[in-house]
Amino acid sequence: MAGDSRNAMNQDMEIGVTSQDHKKIPKQARDYIPIATDRTRLLPEGKKPRQRYMEKTGKCNVHHGNVQETYRYLSDLFTTLVDLKWRFNLLVFTMVYTITWLFFGFIWWLIAYVRGDLDHVGDQEWIPCVENLSGFVSAFLFSIETETTIGYGFRVITEKCPEGIILLLVQAILGSIVNAFMVGCMFVKISQPKKRAETLMFSNNAVISMRDEKLCLMFRVGDLRNSHIVEASIRAKLIKSRQTKEGEFIPLNQTDINVGFDTGDDRLFLVSPLIISHEINEKSPFWEMSRAQLEQEEFEVVVILEGMVEATGMTCQARSSYMDTEVLWGHRFTPVLTLEKGFYEVDYNTFHDTYETNTPSCCAKELAEMKRNGQLLQSLPSPPLLGGCAEAEKEAEAEHDEEEEPNGLSVSRATRGSM
């Protein structure tokens, strides 16, 4: 019983346990068993590569053209500034402050010009609005001192200038508003959790193979950081064009792919790499898709990982996608988690690696019908470690398709089922 529990635990975690009774040696010197991997996928003959809806980095290949109501961007100016690239954001930041300093500097110069202060520069008996303001340059410097509140020095406002006092109040208030808006915009842009998604990994390929006697679509996710993603959740969508019964063509139709929403398996504890599984059942869009049809279909699976950054509490989202050519039929992921002395070690060198495994080539619908009719193979032998999957599958089919009766007659499985 204890052995069965340990095997079940290892299967759920998909780890390979290595004995640590001997002295630990460097990782480069360990003798790992070589496993045949396949990280490439060739396009079938006559099949042209399709444009991706989403890049592997999560960037969507969608451009909005002929937008007439561009004023809508100005109605949400804060978000528009945050979404700008850094070079444009810094340009706007510099221009806003420079323009406000120049504007109020011109007003200070205009007050001095109207009052006649510029005509009495150096006159000890004349009381100007701003002392030692002799031109536009000095007015511009006084405007900077006023708005940045660095303190007056050589130039200072006098009590005999009510219009200057009013302008001082207006510039102080507007300067505070500009500071709050621009500094807030820069702070939000700096603290955006977009870069946190750079350490969230998705496998290069998705795979389709048997798991618990059911066909499953699987892909792997991982987190490189020691600080975890809180309340992590995963969802997936199938992007595929289709035509309705009425003849309407829907390009890039989106269909939800169940990755454990009804069972809670979509809520992840992403401490170590996890394999996300989608069971291909009656509600799955892959229900009638066989291996041969997979090579002819054109679709894209978009996966979205969401959660809160542990350090800041902000929501982070990482995205990736798998084209139809990146879905490997009859493959499984190579285990990456090993049990060391006192801890578990994740080897990210094999994070994207897969190996071939015996998998029926028919669709899940036909597989379910065969199971109902009692035509399923009781067990499929595991393929040799370094290949030979095709030969092992042929031998298994030959062994179960025909059975020698005592009188020497060969009876097929369908005939035995009718008996």
UniProtKB/Swiss-Prot annotation:
InterPro entries: Ig_E-set, IRK_C, K_chnl_inward-rec_Kir, K_chnl_inward-rec_Kir3.4, K_chnl_inward-rec_Kir_cyto, Kir_TM. Residues 112-135, 155-163 are extracellular. Residues 380-419 are annotated as: Disordered. It catalyses: K(+)(in) = K(+)(out). One of its GO terms (molecular function) is voltage-gated potassium channel activity involved in atrial cardiac muscle cell action potential repolarization. Keywords: Ion channel, Ion transport, Membrane, Phosphoprotein, Potassium, Potassium transport, Transmembrane, Transmembrane helix, Transport, Voltage-gated channel. GO terms for cellular component: external side of plasma membrane; I(KACh) inward rectifier potassium channel complex; plasma membrane; T-tubule; voltage-gated potassium channel complex. Residues 380-390 have a biased composition (Low complexity). Residues 136-147, 148-154 dip into the membrane without crossing it. It is a multi-pass membrane protein. Residues 409-419 have a biased composition (Polar residues). Belongs to the inward rectifier-type potassium channel (TC 1.A.2.1) family. KCNJ5 subfamily. Associates with KCNJ3/GIRK1 or KCNJ6/GRIK2 to form a G-protein-activated heteromultimer pore-forming unit. The resulting inward current is much larger. Inward rectifier potassium channels are characterized by a greater tendency to allow potassium to flow into the cell rather than out of it. Their voltage dependence is regulated by the concentration of extracellular potassium; as external potassium is raised, the voltage range of the channel opening shifts to more positive voltages. The inward rectification is mainly due to the blockage of outward current by internal magnesium. Can be blocked by external barium. This potassium channel is controlled by G proteins. This is G protein-activated inward rectifier potassium channel 4.
